[in-house]
Amino acid sequence: MSLTKTERTIIVSMWAKISTQADTIGTETLERLFLSHPQTKTYFPHFDLHPGSAQLRAHGSKVVAAVGDAVKSIDDIGGALSKLSELHAYILRVDPVNFKLLSHCLLVTLAARFPADFTAEAHAAWDKFLSVVSSVLTEKYR
């Protein structure tokens, strides 16, 4: 699945706004994930998962930074996230379905934080982009 030029433009232009709030968005996305899908907490037994904890904020920053890497390398997302894919497949052994759950939580967070920018067209573009990211992150599982 490849992104159209219009979709890429939407992703890159929204990223300029998102990146200014990256840490907050990452934290909020993870809080949403753990609240909506508590089974995902099993991958973080050593974390303080209370809302706003330092560990939650730090990991949220990493998650959004990885999305930023994908945006910056939108024409080579596979290359940008290859090491992250290997980490999650071979070392952390994260169930691939969790990437879709996380993507959904990020979409909800973006819609809540950027209601004027998150049009139906933007929603579709971000959904497709995050599907590509999820696919890249799970390709090492095969």
From Swiss-Prot:
Positions of post-translational Phosphothreonine modification: T29
Gene Ontology cellular component annotations, sorted alphabetically: extracellular exosome; haptoglobin-hemoglobin complex; hemoglobin complex
Keyword Heme set for record: yes
S-S bonds: none
Residue ranges occupied by any Globin domain in the UniProt entry: 2-142
Residues involved in heme b binding: H59, H88
UniProt keyword list: Acetylation, Heme, Iron, Metal-binding, Oxygen transport, Phosphoprotein, Transport
Keyword Nucleus part of the UniProt annotation: no
Positions bearing N-acetylserine: S2
Tissues showing expression: Detected in fetal erythrocytes (at protein level).
Modified residues (Phosphoserine): S53, S73, S82
BP term (GO), one: negative regulation of transcription by RNA polymerase II
Gene3D superfamilies cross-referenced by the UniProt entry: Globins (1.10.490.10)
Function according to Swiss-Prot or TrEMBL: The zeta chain is an alpha-type chain of mammalian embryonic hemoglobin.
Family membership noted in the UniProt record: Belongs to the globin family.
Identification of the protein by name: Hemoglobin subunit zeta
Species whose genome carries this gene: Homo sapiens
Gene, per the UniProt record: HBZ
